């Protein structure tokens, strides 16, 4: 599922 990929992307994006 892409949900897991989105979660990882969100986590990386939240690393501002």
UniProtKB/Swiss-Prot annotation:
Alphabetically sorted, this entry's keywords are: Ribonucleoprotein, Ribosomal protein
Any one of the GO CC terms: ribonucleoprotein complex
User: Could you name the domain of life of the organism this protein comes from?
Assistant: Bacteria
What's the stated role of this polypeptide? Involved in the binding of tRNA to the ribosomes.
Instruction: State the oligomer form and interacting partners.
Output: Part of the 30S ribosomal subunit.
What family is this? Belongs to the universal ribosomal protein uS10 family.
- From the Swiss-Prot or TrEMBL record, give the protein name: Small ribosomal subunit protein uS10
Q: Which organism is it from?
A: Geobacillus stearothermophilus (Bacillus stearothermophilus)
The gene name reads rpsJ
């Amino acid at each position: 599922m892409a949900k897991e990929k989105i979660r990882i992307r969100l986590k990386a994006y939240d690393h501002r």
